[in-house]
From Swiss-Prot:
Residues 1-22 are annotated as: Disordered. GO terms for biological process: Rho protein signal transduction. It comes from Caenorhabditis elegans. It comes from the Eukaryota. It is found in: Cytoplasm. InterPro entries: Ig_E-set, Rho_GDI, RhoGDI_dom_sf. It holds the Pfam family Rho_GDI. The gene is rhi-1. This is Probable rho GDP-dissociation inhibitor.
Length: 191
């Protein structure tokens, strides 16, 4: 399965059933008699519950997103306060034909997060022109910031593609928990 997929239609014949979620403590306490497995799990999962922000009940706290154009940071947005994003005017300009990608910085706290996804729907003049879903992966809680970079994309080019696009973005997981939901504007420019 690729890292990103077009979510326009579901062609899968199989329905994947996710195994039940286990807490970090349950995972650490399983197979206690196997010393090498105990060391491996402690290295992978840490020593127990990690809490970065006690006031925030979410398992994933998205801190920022950066737009990287041709490998260099072009713009960065602070996403750490979702309330400030409601009426904000986040706007990005990309030169047509440029290679770009998004880089997310986030914390994972409390429990393992399985199947973290970044989804976006892009509209122009009210018509959906793109609907994508990127698999970010599964993450164990850590005090350190974790990062995900989307695959490289090429901005559309040509007179018909220049202009203003509205992007509706969302970060979710396999359990359909929504960690962040925001909108931004993308301008494809000639220069």
């Amino acid at each position: 399965m690729s890292d990103h997929e077009n979510t326009g239609e579901n062609t899968s014949e199989y329905q994947y059933k996710q195994p039940p979620q286990k807490s970090i403590d349950e995972l650490l306490n399983a197979d206690k008699e196997d010393e090498s497995l105990k060391v491996y799990k402690a290295k992978l999962l840490g020593q127990g519950t990690v809490i970065v922000d006690e006031k925030n009940p979410l398992r994933v706290i998205v801190r920022s997103v950066e737009l990287l154009i041709n490998g260099k940071t072009a713009q960065s947005f602070d996403l750490s306060d979702p309330a400030k994003l409601v009426n904000s005017d986040l706007s990005v300009s990309i030169k047509e034909g440029s290679n770009y990608r998004l880089s997310f910085a986030f914390h994972v706290q409390r429990e393992i997060t399985s199947g973290l996804h970044y989804k976006h729907k892009v509209k122009r003049s009210g018509i959906t022109v793109e609907n994508e879903k990127y698999m970010m992966g599964s993450y164990a809680p850590k005090l350190e910031i974790q990062e995900y970079k989307s695959p490289n994309e090429e901005a559309p080019s040509g007179m018909m593609h220049r202009g203003k696009y509205k992007v509706y973005s969302k970060i979710t997981d396999d359990d359909n928990n929504v960690y962040l939901d925001w909108q931004w504007t993308l301008h494809i420019t000639k220069e």
